[in-house]
């Protein structure tokens, strides 16, 4: 819930309600990410201190101009790393900096994915991503990494669209000398048009399916067998 504009209590209540309807009971304590912000900021400062992060003083106008040039060249936007090696003594006094992680530039990183096998990426394509905004609040990739480490997560399973985030988070793990968890990225559910199914496109919720009489056992089996099968077995139980 680090995104204050989109995080609301009713969303949390609905998630827990939907999981219970599916028959998935969480056996741990309820965890609220925003209560751990001080831990996230502490790690950002450690990364800054050990040379794995830096303060970026680019103005909003500079960033927008970089994005505009990338669009004109039909290239994905990657921050140009302007402040990566500039001494802080040269910093402007009227701009509050963000803190960026100093991503590796040379070589490549290999993700040993439990579903997709070895996935390799050129490190130069991973931007120096923001870990602390200029208002001092942490971003998703920092918060999620710190939380997963502190909660001793051994396996992280999520959608294929998070793969680029995994490469970023792996760099934080390595910079902090933390043990890497095992990662698995699963295919996304798409619409008839081939687009990613999204709540922004008015995709149905579990509550919608419940109201029209879909049984949780049926929906679980349907989701499980999307893109996967086990011999001729069609019915699975928790």
PLM regions and their residue ranges:
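Generic, well-ordered alpha-helical scaffold segments in large soluble proteins
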Residues: 18, 50, 172-175, 212, ...
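A conserved active-site cap/scaffold subdomain adjacent to cofactor or substrate pockets
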Residues: 201, 205-238
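Active-site cores that bind ATP or allylic diphosphates and position pyrophosphate for catalysis
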Residues: 33, 49-185, 190-197, 205, ...
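Short acidic (Asp/Glu) and glycine-rich catalytic loops that position anionic groups and cofactors
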Residues: 22-24, 149-152, 196-202, 218-224
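Acidic, metal-coordinating catalytic cores used for nucleic-acid/nucleotide bond scission
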Residues: 3-8, 35-37, 162, 190
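Glycine/small-residue-rich interface belts in oligomeric ring/scaffold proteins
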Residues: 6, 10-14, 174, 189, ...
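A short, structured active-site edge motif that brings together acidic residues
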Residues: 27-35
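N-terminal, positively charged nucleic-acid-binding surface of large information/translation enzymes
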Residues: 1-27, 40-49, 59-62, 70, ...
């Amino acid at each position: 819930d680090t995104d204050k504009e989109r995080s609301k209590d009713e969303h949390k209540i609905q998630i827990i309600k939907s999981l219970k309807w599916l028959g998935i009971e969480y056996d741990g304590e309820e965890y609220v990410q925003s209560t751990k912000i001080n831990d996230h900021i502490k790690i950002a400062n450690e990364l800054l201190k050990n040379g794995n992060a830096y303060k970026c003083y680019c103005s909003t106008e500079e960033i927008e101009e970089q994005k505009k040039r990338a669009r004109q060249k039909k290239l994905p936007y990657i921050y140009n790393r302007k402040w990566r090696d500039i001494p802080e003594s040269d910093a402007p006094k009227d701009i509050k900096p963000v803190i960026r992680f100093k991503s590796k530039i040379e070589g490549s990183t290999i993700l040993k994915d439990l579903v997709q096998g070895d996935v390799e990426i050129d490190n130069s394509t991973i931007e120096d991503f923001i870990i602390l905004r200029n208002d001092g609040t942490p971003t998703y990739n920092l918060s999620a990494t710190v939380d997963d480490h502190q909660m001793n997560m051994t396996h992280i399973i999520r959608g294929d669209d998070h793969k680029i985030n995994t490469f970023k988070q792996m760099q934080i793990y390595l910079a902090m000398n933390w043990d890497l968890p095992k990662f698995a990225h699963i295919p996304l559910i798409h619409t008839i048009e081939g687009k990613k199914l999204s709540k922004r496109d008015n995709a149905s919720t579990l509550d919608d399916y419940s109201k029209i009489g879909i049984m949780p056992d049926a929906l679980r089996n349907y989701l499980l067998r999307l893109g996967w099968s086990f011999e001729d077995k069609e019915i699975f139980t928790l």
